[in-house]
C-alpha cells in the first residue's frame, strides 16, 4: 500500500487579498503577503499577488498631483529619530540622495536601481514616514 503525498491546502489568494485590501489597505496586505511567502515559498500565485500589490503601490505614488516632478523631503520625524527606522541598504542610499531640491525623476536617474525599485522604495519610505512628498 503506497501512501500518496498529502499536498497542503491551496489558498484562495484572490479572495483573501481582495478582502484584506478592502479592510486594511494595500500596505497591510503587502506585509501579510510577505509573511505568507515565508510560509508558502513555492506558491507562484502568491508571488504574483505580491507583484500586483507592488505595482499598485507605485501607481499610488505616481498618482501624486506632481507625479515624478514632486520633490521628496526628509521628514522631521526621520531627522530627529532616524535610528528608529530600520532601513535597507537601498532605502538608505535613496535617503542619502534626498536633499529637498531634487525631484523624483532626477532621483530615478541618479539611483543605481531600476526605476520601478526606486519608485517602490520611495513609496515605502513615504509610508514609513521617513520622507514626505508635499503637494
Task: Tell what function each PLM region has.
Residues 63-92:
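Short alpha-helical segments that sit at the start of domains
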Residues 1-60, 83-135:
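Long, charge-rich, low-complexity alpha-helical segments
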Amino acid at each position: 500500500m503506497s501512501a500518496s503525498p498529502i499536498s497542503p491546502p491551496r489558498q484562495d489568494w484572490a479572495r483573501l487579498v481582495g478582502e484584506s485590501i478592502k479592510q486594511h489597505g494595500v500596505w497591510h496586505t503587502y506585509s501579510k503577503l510577505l509573511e505568507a511567502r515565508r510560509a508558502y515559498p513555492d506558491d507562484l500565485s502568491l508571488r504574483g499577488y505580491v507583484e500586483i500589490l507592488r505595482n499598485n503601490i507605485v501607481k499610488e505614488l505616481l498618482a501624486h498631483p506632481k507625479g515624478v516632478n514632486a520633490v521628496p523631503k526628509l521628514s522631521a520625524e526621520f531627522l530627529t529619530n532616524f535610528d528608529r527606522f530600520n532601513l535597507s541598504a537601498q532605502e538608505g542610499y535613496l535617503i542619502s540622495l534626498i536633499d529637498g531640491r531634487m525631484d523624483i525623476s532626477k532621483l530615478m536617474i541618479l539611483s543605481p536601481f531600476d526605476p520601478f525599485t526606486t519608485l517602490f522604495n520611495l513609496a515605502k519610505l513615504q509610508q514609513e514616514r521617513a520622507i514626505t512628498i508635499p503637494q
